[in-house]
Amino acid sequence: SLDRRQRQMCIRDRDCHYQLNGSFTGDSSITILKDFSCKYVILGHSERRSYYNETNLTVKKKSKICRENGIQPIICVGESFIRRKDGSYMNFILNQIEECIEPNLDEVIVAYEPIWAIGTGETPLNKEINEVKEKINLFLKNSKNVKSAKFLYGGSVDSNNFNEIIIGSDSDGALVGGASVKEEEITKIITNADFN
């Protein structure tokens, strides 16, 4: 039922500042997020990287302050259409992971959002999503000594493809963008989602 699914949800934010508190217009401070019992923060989204020139180092600083304050960062990674086509996408993604994520963590959540799929209505094939998931998980385990990793997919996720992507790609969840601000779409996703 929808009520049961609502109880499974929690508060998350779309970004934060890398200092604990202060006057950072347009950014949420960790102190405020804690006051609202925020459990997750999305960091390194492609729009933040593009519009605000956010770097991997900035994402790493934000991730560190989140972890120090009991908030789980969701680290976004993903490639452009050009990188996908020229075959350099995996090196690009793993470099983002290398530079954004600290070693020796108990748990990491990575959201794979191919930039070419965001808002375009196009999504990679499930086998392509799985390839990225497998390489990221292997890299986190072998190069970063991460104990547990969760993998989310984001990029043109909507009520028509949510279950197919989550089940078909063996993702642990989705980063829903444009569809999340459309009441009818997000209600359909929540109502029809196969959480088994």
Where do the model's predicted regions map?
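Glycine-rich phosphate-binding loops at beta-strand->alpha-helix junctions
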Residues: 152-161
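C-terminal helical cap(s) of enzyme catalytic domains, especially alpha/beta-barrels
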Residues: 62-67, 168, 180-196
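Single conserved hydrophobic/aromatic residue that forms the stacking wall/gate
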Residues: 1-11
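Glycine-rich phosphate-binding active-site loops on the catalytic face of alpha/beta enzymes
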Residues: 42-51, 75, 79, 114-116, ...
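Glycine-enriched alpha-helix->loop->beta-strand junction motifs that scaffold or abut catalytic
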Residues: 8, 37-41, 72, 167-174, ...
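Short acidic active-site motifs
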Residues: 28-29, 160-161, 185
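Glycine/small-residue-rich loop that forms an oxyanion/phosphate-binding "nest" at active or ligand-binding sites
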Residues: 12-65
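Active-site rim beta-loop-alpha module in soluble metabolic enzymes
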Residues: 69-145
